[in-house]
Amino acid sequence: MRSGVIAKKLGMTRLFLEDGKQVPVTVLQLDSLQVVAQRTTEKDGYTAVQLGAGAAKAKRVSAAQRGHFAKANVEPKRKIAEFRVTPDCLIDVGAEITADHYFAGQFVDIAGTSIGKGFAGAMKRHNFGGLRASHGVSISHRSHGSTGQCQDPGKVFKGKKMAGHMGAARVTTQNLQVVRTDSDRGLIMVKGAVPGSKGGWVTIKDAVKKPAPEQAIRPAAIRAAAVAEETSTGGESNEG
């Protein structure tokens, strides 16, 4: 089982395929996505990787978190999430994950916080039909109708659909298809809508209801920081 990724929702647009069809897509960006920590069975009782995304100002980060990031030798991050993985899919701390982690045609599950709607009535919140527009109905046209039964059972059942707070909840949309990726700009474009507002953070994982993709890179599509530094150092020495 591979690690997922943290992405920022940039908005929606459309792409034109080779056959001329247009596809509505949501554009997601991997913003400085790095491995911050590892969780191992020997030390923690389970296997996982902790990822951080987005650059944060040091003054906006607590002292404990600053120490945590310093230990991993990465810059402070705005968003942190942990993903369970199998031992063979552990990623080195400090490695940067790129958009090539997913490929066009792959199905993914995306989770995020839905847009808050505030206090909503039963018709908007649960798609109720409401009461009649006339003929015996007074000031109750958009009400939900009966709340319970009679003396037996003498209560309102738990989970009864009524008016209440709507949105601002964690939502997972399954089996969204990746249409295109752009590794240079860190973009992943998926077909359809994704939970949350523009600028919100979402997590992307391989679809659990689809077979594990054979083309997927394991343990991940990474750009190790140490390798990048060695390459740049070698390039400078060669120029000299």
From Swiss-Prot:
GO terms for cellular component: cytosolic large ribosomal subunit. Keywords: Methylation, Ribonucleoprotein, Ribosomal protein, RNA-binding, rRNA-binding. GO terms for biological process: translation. The modification N5-methylglutamine is found at Q151. The keyword RNA-binding applies. Methylated by PrmB. Gene3D superfamilies: 3.30.160.810, Translation factors (2.40.30.10). GO terms for molecular function: rRNA binding; structural constituent of ribosome. InterPro entries: Ribosomal_uL3 (IPR000597), Ribosomal_uL3_bac/org-type (IPR019927), Transl_B-barrel_sf (IPR009000). Belongs to the universal ribosomal protein uL3 family. One of the primary rRNA binding proteins, it binds directly near the 3'-end of the 23S rRNA, where it nucleates assembly of the 50S subunit. Part of the 50S ribosomal subunit. Forms a cluster with proteins L14 and L19. This is Large ribosomal subunit protein uL3. It comes from Cereibacter sphaeroides (strain ATCC 17023 / DSM 158 / JCM 6121 / CCUG 31486 / LMG 2827 / NBRC 12203 / NCIMB 8253 / ATH 2.4.1.).
